[in-house]
């Protein structure tokens, strides 16, 4: 099943994405990010990460470099838990 999902993403990248103007605000692109996430974490977690990434890719987002995490989590971990007062 993982191979089917990865082939669908590649199909999108090869045949559908070139028909649209580039709008992704992130590097790697959202489709590449999702592909890498599915490879790294499997179908469920990979697609969840990809879906969350697409939701974050919008006009009010700064965008920038956002690689697939090495550990699975949907929300970025904060270092504010040990704030000094």
From Swiss-Prot:
One CC-aspect GO term: plasma membrane
Localization annotation: Cell inner membrane
Topological type in the membrane: Peripheral membrane protein
Superkingdom of this protein's organism: Bacteria
Record keywords, A-Z: Cell inner membrane, Cell membrane, Membrane
Function: Could be involved in insertion of integral membrane proteins into the membrane.
Record NCBIfam families: membrane protein insertion efficiency factor YidD
Record-stated family: Belongs to the UPF0161 family.
Name of the protein in question: Putative membrane protein insertion efficiency factor
